[in-house]
Amino acid sequence: GLFVGHHIAALQIEKAAGVKMAYIPNKSGGSGAMKAVIAGEVMAGVNNLSDAFRAREAGTIKILGVADLERNAFMEDVPTMMEQGLDVDNASVNFRGVMVPKGTPQAIIDKLAETVPAMFANGRVAGKMKAGGSPMHIMTRDEVLAMWAAREVTLKDLLAGL
């Protein structure tokens, strides 16, 4: 979809490489886009690593690079885009978070901020994430707020004129 992680990464790659890629919407989302790459219907694709991980394990694709600041812990042989000379950071990385409605008492927000990271440290949760090729990057509330402030600057520049 427009302005989701895949699109942001593609825009960053275009800008860094000085190229223009064709944007081909897919009604089936990331899984449909991955199928198009595997079938040779498109020359390449920008997908979530969790989708690409499974296709790579099956031997149907080669992952050329990751749009992140560091290599993926489960695919350490795949370089980052920056390592390959492309100015592509982690602005497209899809993070998951816990949200509450506006007006939620601060005591509840503080309790969630204190306890949620431990939930993700659970071995069962970590194992499921690893099986899907998604290493966890557990962040505090303050780290998330700082990350979004930095991303806002990057995205405003990247999306200007679209």
Language-model features, listed with the residues they occupy:
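Conserved, function-defining micro-sites of small-solute handling proteins
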Residues: 1-162
